[in-house]
UniProtKB/Swiss-Prot annotation:
Organism: Mus musculus (Mouse)
Keyword Manganese: no
Listed name of the protein: Putative lipid scramblase CLPTM1
Keywords: Acetylation, Developmental protein, Differentiation, Glycoprotein, Membrane, Phosphoprotein, Transmembrane, Transmembrane helix
Ranges annotated as spanning the membrane: 355-375, 391-411, 417-437, 478-498, 503-523
Length: 664
C-alpha cells in the first residue's frame, strides 16, 4: 500500500504548465480571447495528476505569511527606527491626499518604461475626472468602481516579444500630470505608478516522435521555433484585465518603519516627509489559463482597466499573496509551478462553499499530523522488527523499484529541484528498509569496477524458516501471471500510439505509466499472505491506519479541488485495498485463548505478567529483616558479587568442621 501511494504522490508532484484558454470567462466577468491556431503548443506528453495535498499546503503557507505580516503591521515601531539622520526623532507622516479629495485619473499605455509623451493622444487610454478619494458608493454598481474597455493597436515591437507598460497618474482636481505644464503641475498633487502589463512565460518544447514511424503530431511552426530558439522559449503573454486600486489608508506611517512587503508600496516625499496615496495594480484573480501568447498575427489587444478603492486589510492580503516565495533561488521553474498552484487555490476559493473550504483547511491540518505519524511509525516498525513472519519481503524490493523508476522519470522530465530532493529521500528510506528485511554485507574480495565492494544479499533466518517465504513466492508467482501480460500490452500501446524523446524516455515513461496505473496490484501479495496465515497481527497497523486516513482526506481534496479522473480513481482503489485489510482484521482477529506451540495462550501470558508485577510490587513494600552480625561471623558470610547473573550461579558450601571430618 505504501509503495503505490509513493508512486501516486511522486507522480502527482510532476505537473505540466497550463496552456492558454479558449473563450474562457475570467473571474471578474471578462471573456478571454481565443488563442490563434498557429500559437497553440503541441499536445504535451501525459503528465501525472496534481497532488491536492501540495495545493492545501500552499494555502496554509500563505495563511502563515498573511498572519506574520499582519502581526508585524500591528506591532509598534521599534525605538531604533524613531531617530533619523543625526539623531533627530522621526515624526509620523500623513497622507498627501486627505480623505474626500477630488482626483483625476489619467491612464497611458506606452512601449517605454519611463513615460514623457503626454501630448500623444494615442498614448492616452483612459481619463476619469472628479473621483473622490475614499468614496465607496459611486460608480455604476454603487461600489466606488469604474471601468474602461478598448482595443489597443500594438506596434511591431510588441508583436515581436517586446514589452508594453501602463502608466497611471492620480492628480488633485485642477492639476495635470505633465511636468512641462508649469501652471497645472504640482509635485505634491501628483502620484504616479507604472507597470509592465504583459507577462513573460516559458514555453517548453520537447522534440518527440513516434519511435516506430518517426512521425510527430507537433505543429511544424513549433518545430521550426524550437530549432531556432531551443527547447525553452520565453514568450510574451497577455491578459485582458487589470485593476487599479487606490488604498483607502491614512495610517501615520513612519519612514523606515513600514514592514515588508508593504514598504515597497508606501512612497514618501523627500522634502515634506509625507507619503503619497498607495496605488496597487491588482491582477490576483487573473488565472494563468486565461493568458495567451502575443505574436505577429495579433494586430490589436483587448484591455479592460478597472478602478476600485481598496481597504487596508485587503491590501495587506494581496500584498502578502503577491510576494515571491523565498525558495525562488532554486529556479524559475519552481516559481512558475507556484503560479499554477495558486491558480488551483483561486479556483477553489471561487467555486467552493466557504463552509466546505473551512472544513478542508481544518482537515488539511489533521492530514499533516497523520502524515508525520505515519512516517514515524513506519520507521519505528521496521527499526524494531526482529521477525519477518507474515511480511512480504518482495513487496519491499518492488517498492524500491517503483521509487527508483519515479526518480529517473522526474529527472528525465527536468522537474524542479524540490520534487527531486523529496523523491530522492523516499528512495533512501526504501533502500534502508532492505537492510531490515535482508542481511546485507559488503564483499571486499569482489569489487565493482575494481573500486567499490560488491554488496551481497541474504534472506534472514526468520524469513527462510517461516512459511511466509513460501506464500510470498507463491503470491508473486500468481501476480506475475497478471503483471507481465499487462506490462507487455501497455508497452505495445505506448510504442504504437505515444510519442517519446528516445528509447530511454520510452522505457521510463512506459514503466512509470504502468506503475501509476497498475501499481496498486503490488499490494495484493500481503493480502495473500494474510489469507494463508489466517492472521494480520504482524502488520504495522498504526502506520496503515494513518495512511488510510490520509487517503480518505485525499478523497475529500480530490472532490473539492478539480483533479483528473485517474487521480480520483487512484484514491478510490487505495480505499478498496484498505477495506480489504480491515475485513481481514475482522475475520482473522486475535484469539487470546488460543494455545501456541509452547503450550501457552494469550490469557496465560497476561495472567503470568500480572502475577509477576504484583509480586514485584509486594516485595518492594516489605522491609528486609535486619540482624546484628559479629565481626567473626561477618567474615564467614559470602560477599555478593555485582551483576545480574550472580543470582543464578551456585555458591560453594562452607568448609566442614574438624569433628565432622572425623565422623566421615
Amino acid at each position: 500500500m505504501a509503495a503505490a501511494q509513493e508512486a501516486d504522490g511522486a507522480g502527482s508532484a510532476v505537473v505540466a504548465a497550463g496552456g492558454g484558454s479558449s473563450g474562457q470567462v475570467t473571474s471578474n466577468g471578462s471573456i478571454g480571447r481565443d488563442t490563434p491556431a498557429e500559437t497553440q503548443p503541441q499536445n504535451p506528453p501525459p503528465q501525472p495528476a496534481p497532488n491536492a495535498w501540495q495545493v492545501i499546503k500552499g494555502v496554509l503557507f500563505r495563511i502563515f505569511i498573511i498572519w506574520a505580516i499582519s502581526s508585524w503591521f500591528r506591532r509598534g515601531p521599534s525605538p531604533q527606527d524613531q531617530s533619523g539622520p543625526g539623531g533627530a526623532p522621526r515624526v509620523a507622516s500623513r497622507n498627501l491626499f486627505p480623505k474626500d479629495t477630488l482626483m483625476n485619473l489619467h491612464v497611458y499605455i506606452s512601449e517605454h518604461e519611463h513615460f514623457t509623451d503626454f501630448n500623444a493622444t494615442s498614448a492616452l487610454f483612459w481619463e476619469q475626472h472628479d473621483l473622490v478619494y475614499g468614496d465607496w458608493t459611486s460608480g455604476e454598481n454603487s461600489d466606488g468602481c469604474y471601468e474602461h474597455f478598448a482595443e489597443l493597436d500594438i506596434p511591431q515591437s510588441v508583436q515581436q516579444n517586446g514589452s508594453i507598460y501602463i502608466h497611471v497618474y492620480f492628480t488633485k482636481s485642477g492639476f495635470h500630470p505633465d511636468p512641462r505644464q508649469k501652471a497645472l503641475y504640482r509635485r505634491l498633487a501628483t502620484v504616479h505608478m507604472s507597470r509592465m502589463i504583459n507577462k513573460y512565460k516559458r514555453r517548453r518544447f520537447q522534440k518527440t516522435k513516434n519511435l516506430l514511424t518517426g512521425e510527430t503530431e507537433a505543429d511544424p511552426e513549433m518545430i521550426k521555433r524550437a530549432e531556432d530558439y531551443g527547447p525553452v522559449e520565453v514568450i510574451s503573454h497577455w491578459h485582458p484585465n487589470i485593476t487599479i486600486n487606490i488604498v483607502d489608508d491614512h495610517t501615520p506611517w513612519v519612514k523606515g518603519s513600514v514592514p515588508p512587503p508593504l514598504d515597497q508600496y508606501v512612497k514618501f516625499d523627500a522634502v515634506s516627509g509625507d507619503y503619497y496615496p498607495i496605488i496597487y495594480f491588482n491582477d490576483y484573480w487573473n488565472l494563468q489559463k486565461d493568458y495567451y501568447p502575443i505574436n505577429e498575427s495579433l494586430a490589436s489587444l483587448p484591455l479592460r482597466v478597472s478602478f476600485c478603492p481598496l481597504s487596508l486589510w485587503r491590501w495587506q492580503l494581496y500584498a502578502a499573496q503577491s510576494t515571491k516565495s523565498p525558495w525562488n533561488f532554486l529556479g524559475d521553474e519552481l516559481y512558475e509551478q507556484s503560479d499554477e498552484e495558486q491558480d488551483s487555490v483561486k479556483v477553489a476559493l471561487l467555486e467552493t462553499s466557504p463552509y466546505l473550504l473551512a472544513l478542508t483547511i481544518i482537515v488539511s491540518i489533521v492530514h499533516s499530523v497523520f502524515e508525520f505519524l505515519a512516517f514515524k511509525n513506519d520507521i519505528q516498525f521496521w527499526n524494531s522488527r526482529q521477525s519477518l513472519e507474515g511480511l512480504s519481503v518482495r513487496s519491499v524490493f518492488f517498492g524500491v523499484f517503483q521509487s527508483f523508476v519515479v526518480l529517473l522519470y522526474i529527472l528525465d522530465n527536468e522537474t524542479n529541484f524540490v520534487v527531486q530532493v523529496s523523491v530522492f529521500i523516499g528512495v533512501l528510506i526504501d533502500l534502508w528498509k532492505i537492510t531490515k528485511v535482508m542481511d546485507v554485507r559488503l564483499d571486499r574480495e569482489h569489487r565493482v569496477a575494481g573500486i567499490f565492494p560488491c554488496p551481497t544479499f541474504k534472506d534472514k533466518s526468520t524469513y527462510i524458516e517461516s512459511s511466509t517465504k513460501v506464500y510470498d513466492d507463491m503470491a508473486f508467482r500468481y501476480l506475475s501471471w497478471i503483471l507481465f501480460p499487462l506490462l507487455g500490452c501497455y508497452a505495445v500501446y505506448s510504442l504504437l500510439y505515444l510519442e517519446h524523446k528516445g528509447w530511454y524516455s520510452w522505457v521510463l515513461s512506459m514503466l512509470y505509466g504502468f506503475l501509476l496505473t497498475f501499481g496498486f496490484i503490488t499490494m495484493t501479495p500481503q493480502l495473500f499472505i494474510n489469507y494463508k496465515l489466517k492472521s494480520v497481527a504482524h502488520l504495522p497497523w498504526r502506520m496503515l491506519t494513518y495512511k488510510a486516513l490520509n487517503t480518505f482526506i485525499d478523497d475529500l481534496f480530490a472532490f473539492v479541488i478539480k483533479m483528473p479522473v485517474m487521480y480520483r480513481i487512484g484514491c478510490l482503489r487505495d480505499d478498496v485495498v484498505f477495506f480489504i485489510y480491515l475485513y481481514q482484521r475482522w475475520i482473522y482477529r486475535v484469539d487470546p485463548t488460543r494455545v501456541n506451540e509452547f503450550g501457552m495462550s494469550g490469557e496465560d501470558v497476561s495472567a503470568a505478567a500480572s502475577r509477576a508485577q504484583a509480586s514485584t510490587a509486594a516485595g518492594a513494600l516489605t522491609p528486609a529483616p535486619s540482624t546484628a552480625v559479629s565481626g567473626e561471623d561477618a567474615s564467614t558470610v559470602p560477599k555478593a558479587t555485582s551483576g545480574a547473573c550472580t543470582a543464578s550461579q551456585p555458591q560453594e558450601a562452607p568448609p566442614k568442621p574438624a569433628e565432622d571430618k572425623k565422623k566421615d
